[in-house]
Amino acid sequence: MTQALQALIDQAWEDRTSLSPKSAPADIREAVANVIGQLDAGTLRVAEKQGKDWIVNQWVKKAVLLSFRLEDNAPMSAGGFAQFYDKVPTKFANWSGDDFAKAGFRVVPPAVARRGSFIAKNAVLMPSYVNIGAYVDEGTMVDTWATVGSCAQIGKNVHLSGGVGIGGVLEPLQANPVIIEDNCFIGARSEVVEGVIVEENSVISMGVYLGQSTKIYDRETGEIHYGRVPAGSVVVAGNLPSKDGKYSLYCAVIVKKVDAQTRAKTSLNDLLRGD
């Protein structure tokens, strides 16, 4: 079933310029709807960790992108307090109290999640936004005005602080989703975009900006990473001097490494303030 579904999505992607809400064949519509439904239920993911590596299911991402070609904009309501005009319905549009109780997470108004996103048990959505294809795992807090971009993968027991931006894959088009692994803390107003991976047990301080071109400087070793924050890193915003010493450019600085036990026993303030 999955192989046949993947083959149909891959072919539809090749023919995407010819697809529209009026012209798309029924089998393609059904295939895309199937994928979006599985993403919504958490039975299918855009990216999965296999061993130490993350594997991106590109065909699933293609289905998300195709879904925008297959639907017209339509009026929709959210909680009865506002009207919207969009191609993707909200995740909770037709949910009952029993549906929320079974799902086992909290949604604080006016948080919005799009259909095709998955929210696991014991997660909390403060007034925030979770886009289509995103996966938010158990025990994670998405704090006020934080944004989880399309297809982003957020691990267990993560805290996305107020105003955090987790980039998506739709606009601008990205090859791989942003991944925040288990037990990470992302400080207020920080941005993680362009498929950057923040590995488990890491702490990102307030106001840190991470993209594929951002230098991530380890002050203990002098090593520079791109696109990946190593596990257990404590990261703050910083600058590195130019070779001629005339100017400096923004970077992120790994000020220390901590293991899971230290991370659990030490307050965030102590981690960020300590030498």
From Swiss-Prot:
Its EC number is 2.3.1.117. Keywords: Acyltransferase, Amino-acid biosynthesis, Cytoplasm, Diaminopimelate biosynthesis, Lysine biosynthesis, Repeat, Transferase. GO terms for molecular function: 2,3,4,5-tetrahydropyridine-2,6-dicarboxylate N-succinyltransferase activity; nucleotidyltransferase activity. Its main location: cytoplasm. Substrate binds at residues 106, 143. One of its GO terms (cellular component) is cytoplasm. It is found in: Cytoplasm. CDD domains: LbH_THP_succinylT. GO terms for biological process: diaminopimelate biosynthetic process; lysine biosynthetic process via diaminopimelate. Homotrimer. Belongs to the transferase hexapeptide repeat family. NCBIfam families: dapD (TIGR00965), PRK11830.1 (NF008808). This is 2,3,4,5-tetrahydropyridine-2,6-dicarboxylate N-succinyltransferase. It comes from Cupriavidus pinatubonensis (strain JMP 134 / LMG 1197). The lineage of its organism: Bacteria, Pseudomonadati, Pseudomonadota, Betaproteobacteria, Burkholderiales.
